[in-house]
Amino acid sequence: MINNALRTLISSATEQSLDDVLEHEFRTAVQLQQMDQFEWHQVEADLWKRTCLGHEASASFNQNIAHGHTELSLMTSWRVHQPSSSRITGSELELDQLVARVRQAWIQARYLRPEVGVELDTHTDPTVAQTMCYRLLRDEESIQEWLDETFVVKRLGDPGVATPAELCAYTYNRPLATKGKKSMLYLILPRLDDEQRTAYTIWNVSHAVTDGGSLAEVFNTLFQCVIDATPSEPYDSIYTPSAFELNVLPRMPRSVVMAYRQQYQPKPEEIAKAHKVAEVNMRMITEKMGESLALMPSTSWPERKHETVCLCRELEANEVRELLKFAKQVHSGITYLASAATILSAAETFPERKASSKGALVGMVRNARRWISATPLDASLGASTPLGSDAVFLWVPIDTHKTLEPSFSRMQELVTTARHIRHELDKHLTTPHCISSYPYVAESSIQGLNQQWSQIKAVQSPSSSSSQKEIAGIIGAQAPGFSSVGMMRIRPRFEPVSANARASGLWLERTDFTHTGRQINASPWISMFNVDGRIKLQLGFDTKFHEVEKMNQWLDRTVVWMRICAAAAATTSTSVSSTSVDATAPVFARL
């Protein structure tokens, strides 16, 4: 195919010298080869493969070298409302049918949302590319083998499942054990005496193939398949995928970098500028860390064991309405107020940093899908880009030589900090060409991770005699981070496609969602999302590096700031100045 393209170029050349043409053709061939490896290509019958690109690569490498770091455990609670004429409600037969429904839906999701079935490399060689592959399963035997590895059914009250949270904690306190880090689905059945008949699903998945902006699409697909399934005896039979489902290539997960390159065709100068901006951002972390507010890991971390703890706090819908009202009154957004609260709360949780600080570094997540067309530009290429997020760091000036404890009297400090965050973040949301820097940033991250984990292993070896200064040089002060997912768009109600089934009164109600994950590093971030009008603030961290008490204090202070904002909504017009706040800032600046 490439040779044919070269011949066409040569035959059409008129005024160019042959040398110029050959040089151009060589560059074109190299570019085509490079592009091909990042798009799905068939390597054998029913086996597709591509090279990870950008943050897919660094997420996969991080997962490998850090024993499962950032693997997600995403839990939903839900119930199936049976038709009023049903006689199986509250029976073992209802649970048998529930298992059959979810098993079929999990199989269908593997074809309809292929990231569910993707396999990733597990090596830790920084010089070898990370790749992903997808095997198309056609026969009952291979599907059953995949189910045996990835689908687990538990009942509430079983050992290790006293509560759904207990099983969820199990999933994020061990790395995925499946071959190629394939994702898993846990189904927790209700007790027979549970009048609400609430079931739970936990999707345990690599962060390399999903993020907070795309995971809702998987759950929406899964639950629609659950309610559309028509279980019948024998309930352990294996679903046979349809011809449409088997035509999986158009739905395969695509790198957001490749989608960007196809849509925008960046010029060399645009790529170079993006690399420069990214380089400056990474260098700023080193330059500013010494004068920044920060989280302080325990100095005894070499002797401690890894354990992930996930904390969650919730603002009720009425509080969220008042919080939104306050944000509008001060011409800000909940994302900016919450990230400002994260910084100020870190200052008082680790006050030992205040005297030497002139402000704060803060990591913020941005979503590249804001710039990517939802419509495929090439019918042969999939439009799904399930990993579209990355992080940038901002420098926020703050007067640290005073108390920053949550208080109504210090509301102006919070609003001013939120204003600075918005101003700085806007600088990173002006052009899609920032996506050009993702491969460069990812490669830098991989090299840094490899070096850091080599140092960690050396310090933890029995023969190590490292000083406290050397230990602090490996794991030192950590900038706080904030990730705003926005609205979690998992639908609350799912009705069957079949008109007869709908008319019978059969439907599925999704009642809650919780976002947790495995943390095996010293840099905890607070995340925030809105589900059903409620805001959840969540914090996952590694007790090897951080004390549970300190992390509770950090999250609690952040939530107190949010509640103060909500309570202040009625009096803001006279209490908090909005001078110099730009009310016309672009909508896309909101995460």
Curated annotation (Swiss-Prot):
Q: Which domain of life is it from?
A: Eukaryota
Give one GO term, molecular function aspect.
acetyltransferase activity
EC class of the enzyme, as a word: transferase
Pfam annotation, one family: Tri3
Its principal location?
A: other
The membrane-spanning stretches of this chain are none
User: How does inactivating the gene affect the organism?
Assistant: Abolishes completely the production of mannosylerythritol lipids (MELs).
Q: In which pathway does it act?
A: Secondary metabolite biosynthesis
Supply the Gene3D superfamilies for this chain: Chloramphenicol acetyltransferase-like domain, Nonribosomal peptide synthetase, condensation domain
Which EC numbers characterise this protein's activity in its record?
2.-.-.-
| PANTHER family with a match to the protein in the record | ACYL-COA-DEPENDENT ACYLTRANSFERASE MAC1, CHROMOSOME 7, WHOLE GENOME SHOTGUN SEQUENCE-RELATED
Cite the domain annotation text. The C-terminal PTS1-type tripeptide peroxisomal targeting signal is required for the import into peroxisomes.
Q: What does this protein do?
A: Acyl-CoA-dependent acyltransferase; part of the gene cluster that mediates the biosynthesis of mannosylerythritol lipids (MELs), surface-active substances that enhance the availability of water-insoluble substrates. Mannosylerythritol lipid production is responsible for hemolytic activity of Ustilago maydis.
**What's the family?**
Belongs to the trichothecene O-acetyltransferase family.
Name assigned to this protein: Acyl-CoA-dependent acyltransferase MAC1
